[in-house]
Each structure stands twice: as structure tokens, then as C-alpha cells.
Amino acid sequence: MKALLDLFKQVQQEEQFDAIKIGLASPEKIRSWSYGEVKKPETINYRTFKPERDGLFCAKIFGPIKDYECLCGKYKRLKHRGVICEKCGVEVTLAKVRRERMGHIELAAPTAHIWFLKSLPSRLGMVLDMTLRDIERVLYFEAFVVLEPGMTPLKKSQIMSEDDYLAKCDEYGEGEFVAMMGAEGIRELLRGIDIEKQIEQIRAELQATGSEAKIKKFAKRLKVLEAFQRSGIKPEWMILEVLPVLPPELRPLVPLDGGRFATSDLNDLYRRVINRNNRLKRLLELKAPEIIVRNEKRMLQEAVDSLLDNGRRGKAMTGANKRPLKSLAEMIKGKGGRFRQNLLGKRVDYSGRSVIVVGPTLKLHQCGLPKLMALELFKPFIFHKLETMGIATTIKAAKKEVESQTPVVWDILEEVIREHPVMLNRAPTLHRLGIQAFEPVLIEGKAIQLHPLVCAAFNADFDGDQMAVHVPLSLEAQMEARTLMLASNNVLFPANGDPSIVPSQDVVLGLYYTTRDKINGKGEGMTFADISEVIRAYENKEVELASRVNVRITEYELVDKDAEGDARFAPKITLQATTVGRAILSEILPKGLPFSVLNKPLKKKEISRLINTAFRKCGLRETVIFADKLLQSGFRLATRAGISIAIDDMLVPPAKEKIISEASAKVKEYDKQYMSGLVTDQERYNNVVDIWGAAGDQVGKAMMEQLQHEDVVDRNGNTVKQESFNSIYMMADSGARGSAAQIRQLAGMRGLMAKPDGSIIETPITANFREGLNVLQYFISTHGARKGLADTALKTANSGYLTRRLVDVTQDLVVVEDDCGTSNGVAMKALVEGGEVIEALRDRILGRVTVADVVNPETQETAIETGTLLDEDLVDLIDALGVDEVKVRTPLSCDTRYGLCGKCYGRDLGRGVLVNSGEAVGVIAAQSIGEPGTQLTMRTFHIGGAASRAAVASSVEAKATGTVRFTVTMRYVTNAKGELIVISRSGEALITDDHGRERERHKIPYGATLLVQDGQAIKAGTQLATWDALTRPIVSEYTGTTKFENVEEGVTVAKQMDEVTGLSTLVVIDAKRRTAATKGIRPQVKLLDANGQEVKIPGTDHSVTIGFQVGALITVKDGQQVHVGEVLARIPTESQKTRDITGGLPRVAELFEARSPKDAAVLAEVTGTTSFGKDTKGKQRLVITDLDGNAHEFLIAKEKQVLVHDGQVVNKGEMIVEGPADPHDILRLKGIEELAHYIVDEVQDVYRLQGVKINDKHIEVIVRQMLRRVQVADVGDTKFIPGEQVERSELLDENDRVIAEGKRPATYENLLLGITKASLSTDSFISAASFQETTRVLTEAAIMGKTDDLRGLKENVIVGRLIPAGTGLAYHRARKAREASERERAQAIADEEQSLFIEPPPVVQATTEGEGDNA
């Protein structure tokens, strides 16, 4: 019996563990793992194929080859389990122990572990405080290191060459000092380190020193030494005396046909080590000359190096075929390594894949599964059923039965499959909806049938896509698949909360066609009693589908809910003016939706909104049924509509010729201006591109207008316009296929094309596809089309990598509690840019939790309490009240440690309710941001390379009626013509309404001409200012006569003779292209007054000096009279490149990587008054004097645009030098909230440009993870080192502990880490190692003796536990609670026994002990 129980024990190794620790192994530890020493390099006997004794595959050390059978065959079968054969020394046990038993090699000379030597920064170097170069010279026998100086003047750990050593020996005598070479020397040095003493010394030096570099160096060394002290790891273990040998099954030797063997490279590497080791042993026994021994030791060191990490030092060892051998390090790192290949992504049983075809008759929760596939996938279930039914007695018989595919097997398959969901997955799985569960329906054929509505979520189409099927086996898995993953339970996108089951293409076309209305259709104006009458009339061809008629329609209104929570509806009959098609369609409306939602042409956006409304009003079940009905109706009606397209549907607008000839004339005009030198070539190009862009838009507009409307005669005989029934127009208008841009290419003009580098070719393609292109036009258009395809191929990889980094940084962020109780939040406003509302307030706060009461602005009463989740109805209320700012909770200010709380996150967008505890919101955020990235890269090539340019604004007009107000920063002067010229760079114009509330604000650029006054009342549509969009001016703020300085031709400026026009302009040349002597001087102009004195800045004795930037075209002459507001020079702006997501994806990556841009803006460090100090060479000195009178200096390169002027007051964090913002500066000067604003807005800009909706909270979640580390400023009484970077949660925990003891807590500064850096610096070394830089991460963790608490998802997947999210979180919590209660119980029992045994009579004691044994 006991043997049987032991058998089971072997199978179940369910050890529970809560953390994994990594460290360095001591030689004793390595020997304790080992089952014997490998002494010979042999592998297996090539005749008998049996492993050689004491060799690399020795059965005595590693275990038997066959289960329960020793090598010589003396002991076989189970009854001899555990016996060790006296003949061959092999233990009789399972063969799989060869996967876990290790051996060892006793090294004849110690060798250094290459990771601790060469992985930067060198750990050995840090501990010994020696340079890597020196240590390498010692290890590879090029130099001696002094161990014991004795009485000599030598220093400990001093390096000397061999000649030096001999000379010193002669000088001081043989035994006066000890010096060694090789790993032995280093080992002795390490042994001699007194860690405690070193730490004290370094701490003292840290206090004493003031130099930054030294502090950094000491802190690094201190960290390593303290880690050694804390973990109890001895530094000398970095030198190996015993080398462990990997179990043989993990480095297999596989016989190929033809008597050859395929072997793992590790065997070669081990063989080399053993050979060299044995040779060295022999040489030492023979007392060989020092030089030979030394050489052999060096070779041994090199062999061990290659085994551990081949190619890290020197040349990689190569095998017979000249390729480098794969070492142990390569086994674990990279995409094909242990982590990413076998631990994070495994192949699974019970799965299959096949092509998908459309299944229009399926319900949303079903998929069609080919019978043969199902038979294979559900085999074990069928076997079981066959046995229980008594048809087959054994598994073998059952197998036979299934293979013969008898009719009874098919019946059983039907039964087994019922109610058993399967999971379908389409690669690439970019977000949660890439795997969904369906109930299988058996079908003939070999292709999987997929429901059309889930295609959007899978991003699938039926042009040959394949999908994989997986079978959830256990009951729990089936339950989870059904409740959480069933397609009908996932109808919203987790990225933005929109419905994912929206019909597309022909369904949309059918619904649109049905719900269009037509003037004077057959039977217009008839009145019907009910819908069935309409259907009768339609079927008898009395009315057309689009005719306008009146129908009595029954609507169901929600009355209330009864006790069970089921809704009760009351019918309400009204006469509606509608069309035949809409009336017929109204039959499928779910109860609770009014008819008005259908009483309009259903375009794709409308249908999406309709499904969304249904979901919010009628619940999930009704919505799914409704979507299915919509689909069926759409298909049916599209078929009935019979829409097709012909070449005649592409109507070319008659105005096209005229528009094109006008544009050509304008272009010729610009060419003339260029010839006569009024404009530069760059300006001409910009203008030409603009003209053609506008012409293309005009043609497009004319074409759309013609397509859009047609003239018809109404009932009264009048001619009226109605929306056209042109097929192409209907397809584009309904959103079924095609876009205005594509139609423009068919029937308008193709327009401007882009070159592969993104610049626009200035000659447009004036033809369209209907007229056909000539050869030149075709050639130009191939450019763009090919670029689209090439881009797609290259960018998909980038996007996938971005997603990988995002997932890695957020994978451990899980909702762990319902409410953290914080009172912090962020004030949300509508996003307004250039007077347009880009994102309404309602969209930004929907699904968030309020953190302050929302107050009715009219009555000042509380409308919505704090802590309320804002749903659609409440958002409508806020809209109606006219509230323009709401303070809501955000993931950034959540106080939960090691996770998030539900209230700060708000609504789970994929489910439409408050987020559940255990939801892995980090991964969802990462997927929501990464998934569209891939989509965007693939979308480029559909337009076929036609250039899309953002039109340049050259004026700004008011959208609202109201009063103009200028901000305090707005400064302007009046020029000679009486125009107002803006001379501030950050001025804004506001429009306020009668109540003084701000309606819109507009930035007015430098050099613009203002057309309104401060305080002027204006009407909507009034122009506020105009400016030249193609150049930036430099404007004079004073009147006087110009006096040039350093404007020397050929030195600082070049005379650009335009070879075409023969005219010249002065252009400032780049300092980098000047000679060394003239680099520092900069061309500038001063102004002289009437007396010839320099004009001074009022209130100072600084002269007015206006510098010319690089590339500026100087428009004034020396000695010319200039007025205030006159233009002195123009700087041409760069020509436009086409903006698409290429600019986008790298931009998003750059934001999340928190890279400092080059030429970043300079922000004011303090609030104060600016002034200019003395210029140094090449730099200008800007001084800000703060309110206490302290001066802060900034040195700014002279070619930079300074945005402030003398005497201006600036606020902390305000931009003073133009340039892109540096996120690190924003965080430092303006705080977390501003930084989050900046990143969220910038990322959203990129996606918005592509029309992709992502909820802000996903980006905020990522920003939270980028901010999760802090830098310790003042240590207080905590265990940290100053300047150390630690997890915020860890620091707060430590502070709590210190405060509880009444000591001083540590203070810290926020740190912003890029996503890669944040992933690598996570506390979990398993997660970091599986991400990137595996070697470095593991080396560091081992030295630190790090413990991984398995908090994140990734670590748990790798060690094979349930992840602590979703149902796994509940499981882990229950397990921990159970363990705690068991511990308490054990403690209680122990205490009880303790109390019972105060004076125990001997008899009682004996019985108690006896019971203990029996129990």
C-alpha cells in the first residue's frame, strides 16, 4: 500500500510558494545539488548507444535511460524501485529524473564567472574597487596582483607585470610579499574583504566628499556591498571552484538516421571544459613548468567562459561547422530563449487551426466547427462517453471505434459538444477581443464558420484568414470561458467603450437603402393602420421602399421594474410620418427603444449609436438579439436593393476644367514673381503646393455636390433637389465602403502625390481614374502606392514592439481594492483647440467617479454627490446644467499600493459597469494603446499614396459672438500704416460671453496683424488676426535708422543670387559652416535715433539689438529708416511633409519612453523677473530674479528663440526658450498632473489625427507606471541610500514603518522613467529578465540576493501559477487566508498543548505521544 501511495506522491508536486529568491551558489551548494562528478568527456558508446560511465550522460550519476530498469538490465520493473544496482551503479527509478538530476565538475583551478566580470558594470570591479582591465589582466594570466604587501611599500591589490614581479622579488626578497595571478589571486582578494568595515568606510567617505562623481561612485559600490551583507552571499562565490553540469535530458543527444547524432552545443562546451580540466590536473600532478600550467589555466578559464556565455569575451568558440556554439546564456535570453519561447508562450494541446468562412445563419454566440476537427479535439470526452455507455471496454477499443467513425461516434460527439464552449483566436492577438469563446455547431466541410459581427473585434476578413480553436477542458475553464469570454458577453471595445458588434459593408448598405426617403415615391402620403398593412402594400408593389407614408406604430415604454428586476413595458400607439422601409424595419426594435431612433437614414455611425443606446437602455441580452436581427435584415435588404456600380456613376464635375486652368494661371503667376525675385524658391514651392491643394479640394467639393443631389419633380409638379440615389455616393455616405477621398480620385482629380520621403511633388495629377492617367501621371502615382506597402511591412513590427513594451511596464497593475479613499483628482474641462471643441466634456468624464460635488452653476445646489460614477444619464444632466469643469478621480492620484482601486479607475469600458476587483487594467491599457498602432500602420496604403496635407492656417476667426479680451502676455505695436502688429510670442485672444464666461481662446502668433481691439464686441465669424503662414517675420519694436553689425558677406551672411531671377538676398549662414574664428559672432542690427545715438530699451542702458537667426532672409538695407512694427527679416518655414501615423507611432513611442527632445525648450525654474546678463561667446545669458532676490542664470545658445523680453515676469515652469517640451522638466517644475496632461494630450493628438478613439484613462494608467519609482532625497531613519531609486510603494511602506516607531521618514522626488527603463527597473527580476537585457538583470539580482514576491502577472505565468488577476486573484486570496487560518490553528493547538503540559503525569504523556504517532 505504502509503495502505491509513494507512486502518487511522485506525480503531485503541488508545492505552494509565495516568493522566489535568486542568489549565488556556494561550492558546497553546487556539490549538494550534484549526484556525482563527471570525470570523462565521453558521451555515449557509439556501438551500444549506452552512456559511458562517469561521462556527460552517465546513467549512474543522472539516472536510468528506461523507466524502472538499470543499465545492465539486472533489475527491471516496479518491484525494485529505489534499488541501486551493484553492477552498474544505476538507481532503478523513472527516466525523467534525467531532466532534474545535476552533476558537477571539480575544477583543478578556480575560474571567474564571466557574468560578474564582463556584464557591465563589472560586479567584480565594484567589489574590489579595481578596473575591469586590471582584473582581466590578472584573470587571463598577464599580470600579478598583490595580496599581502607584508613589510614592503607595495599596496594591496596593486597590479604588476611579470617583469615587475621578478624585479620586486629580487629587490625585497622571495617571501616578503605575496602576489598571485589568475582567478586564485582574485579569489583571495575577495576572501580578504571585510564587508562591514568597507561599508562603514564608504559611508564615512560619502559624508565627507562633495564631488558629484565621487558620490555616485561610492553610492554604487555601497549598494553592492550592502546587498552582499544583507543577503549573506560571500563575494568569493563569484569565482567558481565547482562547475555544475546540466541534466542530460536538457542537452540531449539525438540519433539521426545514418548513425550520426545531433547534439546540443552545450555538450561540446562541457567536453572542452572537462578535457582542459583533466589535462590541468595531470599537469599539476606532474609538477609541470609554471608557464605551461599557466597557459592551461587560462584555457580552462576561457572554456568555462564560453560555456557560460559564449562570445562575451574574445572570439566565440565555434563548432565543426564554423558557427559559434550556443552557450547557457543564449539558452535563456532573446525571443528563442527559455523565457519567451517556453515559459511565456507555450504551444497547447487540444487546439487546431483552419481557414474561416462567413456563417451568416449563426447566432452571435455560435461558431461553425468542422466535424473532423471536433472529433479530434474532443477525443478524450468521446472516449470517456464510449466507456460509460459500455460500447468500448478499454481506451484502445474506444480509440478504434472513433477511428472507424461509426454513426454512434457522431451521436456521442453531438452530445459531448453541447454546452461545451470553444475558444477562437485570430493572430495577431492585439487586444482582449482577439480570443473569444463560442458554442460550436457541427458542420460539414473543413473551414470554421465565423459570425460576421465579431469580425471587427478579431479584425478578420474572409480572404483566406486562418483562426485557431482551443478547447477549455476543466469545468472551471469551461465556466470562465462561458461567463467571461463568450462572444455575446463582449460587445464593447475595452479601449473606448463603443460597441464592437457593429455591422459593416453590405449590411450597412442594406439598412441605409431601406431607411432612405425619396420625394414623390410611389404611394407617397398614404396612411396605414399598422405595420402588417405596410408590408402587404409593399409586397403588392403599391408603395416603394423609400416612399414617405404615415403609419400607426406601437412603441413600448419602460414603466418600472418588478420584484425580480424584470422590466415592465406599456404599449403606446402613435401615428408617425416615416417611410415604408423604416416602418418595416421597426418590427425588430427591442422593447424600451422609441421609434425615433430608427426614423432617420441609418449610416454606420448611426447604427453604432443605435446599438450603444440599446445596450444602455435594454441591457446585454436584448442588444445581442437586436444586433443579430439587424444583421439578418441588412443582408436580406441589401440583396433586395440590388445596388451595383457602373462607370457612369462616377460623375466628373463640369467645373473641373475651369478650376484647373485657374490654378495653372496662379502657378504661372508665382513663377513670374520668382523670376523677378519677389519670392524665394522655397516660398514659391510652398505656394504652388498650396494652390494645387486648394484646387484639388475645390474639384472634390464640386464633384461631391454634383453626386450628392439630384433634381426631381415633387407631387405638386415643382422641381426640387433631393439627396442622390447614386450608388457610389450611397456606398460612401452610408459608411459601407469607400470615402470622399477615394471618390475624389475616381471622379475628381487625384491631386498632389507624395514622394517616398514624405515631401510633396509639386505637379499634381489632374486626371482621375475615370478619365484615366497618362504614363507620367501613372509613374508619379506608383511612388506613393509602393511606399504605402513598404511602410506597412516595416511598421507592423515597430507597433508590435511598442505594445510589448507597454504590456511589460503595466502587467502588474491590477485593481486590488474597491476604494482607496483618496480626495485627490483632476479637474476635467472640454478640450478646446483654436476655438473648436475637439473633445466635449461629457466624453472626457463619462465613466469616471467624481471627487468633488458637482454644483448647479445657476442655483449653487449640489447636483451630483462626491463618489458617484458618472453614467450616460448623469453626463447628460451635467451637459444640461452647463457645468464646464468637473473634478474626477484618476488612476494617477490613486493611493492604493501595489495596484489600483476601482473608484479611481472608474468604469470598465468593456463591460459598461464599475470595474471589478482583480481586473488587469494595466494590460488592458497597454493593449488599447498598442492595438490601434498596428491598425494605423496597415491603414496607410488604402488611399494609394495621395498626399494628405494639413492646410496651413494664416488667419483666425471667432466662432462665437461676444467680447474680445487679450491675455496679459499679449503685446503689440502700431506700425506706420496704423495696423496692430503682435510682438509677443505667447499672446492669446479670448472671446467671452455676456456672463464673462470664456467661450474660446486663440493663440496669436508673433508678427501677426490684429484686426480687432481689446474689449471690442464682435459677431461670430469676424477675423481676429492674419499672418503669413509660410514665413516667420522679425519685427522691429522701435523706430530708428538701421545699423548692421557683423553682417559680413561670406562670413556671417551669404548673398544668394538666384540663378533664375538674377536678384540677390542676404541669407544668414549656419554657425557650424563658418570658420572657427567667426563661429562666435552673430549678425545683428542696432537702431540709431535722429542724433545718431543707439536707441536704448526704455528703463535700461541696454541698446536695442535684434539678432538674425540662421536661415533668415534680411529684408532691410543698412542705414534704412524703419518704423515700429516693420519687418526686418523673414525666416521661411520648412516645407510641409505629409502627416501620417509614421510621424505618429514613433511620436507615441517617444512620449512613453520619456525621451528628452534635442533642442528642448527651456522652462523657468522659478517665478520672477527676467533680465539679460553679459553675453558669453556663442551663448546669451538670461537671468531670472525670484521674489526673494536670488538670481538664477540660464545660458542659451544664440541661435535659439528667446520668448521673453527684459523685465518680463515669468511663472515657474513657463517656457522661456522655444522648443519642444521636455517631460522631465514638466514633472520637475509643474508636477504630476501637468505632466499627465501633457502626455495624454500629445498621445491623443496622434491618434485623433487618424480618427482612433482611446479613453484617456488608459494613457493615465501607463503614466502612473512610468512614475512608479522615486528618488530618495533625505534618508531620515529609513534603510535607503541617498539618491537611490526605489518603488514608490516600497518607500511609502518603509515610511509608515518608521513613523510608527516615531522616527523620521524619508523624503523623495518623483522620477519619470521611460517604459523600457521602467520595465527593467521593476522589483520583479523574473519579469525584467524576461523582457530585455536578461544577462544584466539576472547578474544584478543574483548579487543582490533579490527576492521576487510574484506580484505581477508575468512572473506568475513564468513560474506556472495562476495569475493574481481575475479569478486567480480570488484564488490566491482564499489560499492565503486558508494558510493564515491554518497557521493560527496550529499555533492555538501548540499553545493549548503548552498549557496542558504544565505538570504532566508520565502516563498521559506517553499516550499523547502515541496518539501523535498514529495521527
From Swiss-Prot:
UniProt remark on cofactor binding: Binds 1 Mg(2+) ion per subunit. Binds 2 Zn(2+) ions per subunit.
GO biological process: DNA-templated transcription
Disulfide cross-links: none
Superkingdom, taxonomy of origin: Bacteria
SUPFAM superfamilies noted in UniProt: beta and beta-prime subunits of DNA dependent RNA-polymerase (SSF64484)
Chain residues that bind Mg(2+): D461, D463, D465
GO cellular component: DNA-directed RNA polymerase complex
A Pfam cross-reference name: RNA_pol_Rpb1_2
Known EC number: 2.7.7.6
Protein family membership: Belongs to the RNA polymerase beta' chain family.
Name this protein carries in UniProt: DNA-directed RNA polymerase subunit beta'
